[in-house]
Amino acid sequence: MKPSIILYKTLPDDLLHRLEAHFTVTQVPNLHPETVARHAQAFASAQGLLGASETVNRALLEKMPALRAASTISVGYDNVEVDALTARKIVLMHTPAVLTETVADTVMALMLTTARRVVDVAERVKAGEWTESIGPAWFGIDVHHKTLGIVGMGRIGMALAQRAHFGFTMPVLYHARRRHQEAEDRFNARYCDLDTLLQEADFVCVILPLTAETRHLFGATQFARMKSSAIFINAGRGPVVDENALIAALQNGEIYAAGLDVFEQEPLSVDSPLLNMSNVVAVPHIGSATHETRYNMMACAVDNLIDALQGKIEKNCVNPQAAG
């Protein structure tokens, strides 16, 4: 008899068939309490859980006594109570490698779009404001040869450093929990403390997960240390930044502009002051959002769950200690 799983994300037919070859699959639209109650027997017997974005917490786990593995279609997992899973000896699988290059492309795009004011001037053209040769009021700033500061030198940070160093001749500074010798050797990246990075970088790019230590790591003090000509990019997690402090820094001219893929509350409120600022490029958490990469993430998550329920957790496991 096949193990049973709960699937709370729509998958392409070929990936769904791959799951069904190994498991009895119950598809649900979400993990809301009413959904769990409606499918109580399926949740109670499920050994696997696969999907994205929904909260996986102790209350849900209480309804899933047979659960052995959860697989998220993402690299981040701040919506999952990992400690609760580990205490139950439930492994959590994620998809860290398949989205690296695509997210780095997104960060680079935010840097270019923000510095060259692409969105702002494109909207002005559409509004009929381009009636003569443009002057300084339409100008942006250069990206090439400017100093890039990367906060979080993981896979994505490395891919961004590669683009900046080889493609744009940018000196690279970085701050991370530990020094990254490969970054220093390949890209001549310079490790420094956060204050130094903020003071010297022309672009401050944040690529951090959300943890107790990183929540509101960037606030009024940090923005005050940045150059008034600096551009701030956040492509990690929204709550790493105190959004009110960022808004104030932009309004007061403490920094030049911001390119934001993530926000404290998502979707971003239509009343957010960020949406009325011409020096802000705000996009809806599109970091990995290409057809190719999202498919690859789903395929990776499917394979992760198949492997995990066969006891294979050598790669992509967040909490391997749970298997002990």
From Swiss-Prot:
It is an enzyme of class 1 (oxidoreductase). It comes from the Bacteria. GO terms for molecular function: glyoxylate reductase (NADPH) activity; hydroxypyruvate reductase (NADH) activity; hydroxypyruvate reductase (NADPH) activity; NAD binding. Its EC number is 1.1.1.79, 1.1.1.81. PROSITE patterns: D_2_HYDROXYACID_DH_2 (PS00670), D_2_HYDROXYACID_DH_3 (PS00671). Keywords: Cytoplasm, NAD, NADP, Oxidoreductase. It catalyses: glycolate + NADP(+) = glyoxylate + NADPH + H(+); (R)-glycerate + NAD(+) = 3-hydroxypyruvate + NADH + H(+); (R)-glycerate + NADP(+) = 3-hydroxypyruvate + NADPH + H(+). GO terms for cellular component: cytosol; plasma membrane. InterPro entries: D-isomer_2-hydroxyacid_DH, D-isomer_2_OHA_DH_cat_dom, D-isomer_DH_CS, D-isomer_DH_NAD-bd, Glyo/OHPyrv_Rdtase_B, NAD(P)-bd_dom_sf. Belongs to the D-isomer specific 2-hydroxyacid dehydrogenase family. GhrB subfamily. Catalyzes the NADPH-dependent reduction of glyoxylate and hydroxypyruvate into glycolate and glycerate, respectively. Homodimer. This is Glyoxylate/hydroxypyruvate reductase B. It comes from Salmonella agona (strain SL483). The gene is ghrB.
